[in-house]
Curated annotation (Swiss-Prot):
Name of protein: Acyl-[acyl-carrier-protein]--UDP-N-acetylglucosamine O-acyltransferase
Key words, A-Z: Acyltransferase, Cytoplasm, Lipid A biosynthesis, Lipid biosynthesis, Lipid metabolism, Repeat, Transferase
Native source species: Enterobacter sp. (strain 638)
Key word Cytoplasm present: yes
Taxonomy of the source species: Bacteria, Pseudomonadati, Pseudomonadota, Gammaproteobacteria, Enterobacterales
Superkingdom of origin: Bacteria
Amino acid sequence: MIDKTAFIHPTAIVEEGAVIGANAHIGPFCIVGPHVVIGEGTVLKSHVVVNGHTIIGRDNEIYQFASIGEVNQDLKYAGEPTRLEIGDRNRIRESVTIHRGTVQGGGLTKVGSDNLFMVNAHIAHDCTVGSRCILANNATLAGHVSVDDFAIIGGMTAVHQFCIIGAHVMIGGCSGVAQDVPPYVIAQGNHATPFGVNIEGLKRRGFSREAITAIRNAYKLMYRSGKTLEEAKPEVAALAEQHPEVKAFTEFFERSTRGLIR
């Protein structure tokens, strides 16, 4: 079903069964598969391919040569009808690839809203990306990676499968991330190691001076006290009782499966 207010360029191919929302724009030489839903106001610039059981929300901008919802690169994939869901107001730049999920990973790759994925960024099968994140040019997420809100991943950085990137994290360019990166942390290198708290990012997002100080104190307990993480955890938990922002650390401890970067 194509809304009467949607624009479909004469050279675009929209297969029967696709749903195109009001005021959507499907540019020249785009291909939209039969199980795709494209929301109101979303723009496919040109030469964009959207395939599979893919739902794209409102007011997204998808640039030329992006491949969205294509078959994943997991060798176990046998053609199951897995899915990709993308939220609203994302900017997906040239040649970005976002693959649909696998049965083994829950069958869903999911992207939130208000993200920027720069040129050649890759989001593999079964990833979960939150909202207001940035993946810089050529940043790569392997399968099953989770990226929490407001995270920034630098150019040419690769994140190992099943890793978790916490909220407000900033990872420098050309890094290799093989373990989980806790919230608020700046990380860099191959293998990525912590370099402090993302203070400037927290200021920009309205964190108070008191909250930032508490986060820094928790970071020091984890990384600068000479204690093991297990030894530091009770003290971080005690700090979290006084400062709600620190609870992000204690909650992250429970989620982590690959261990924290050290």
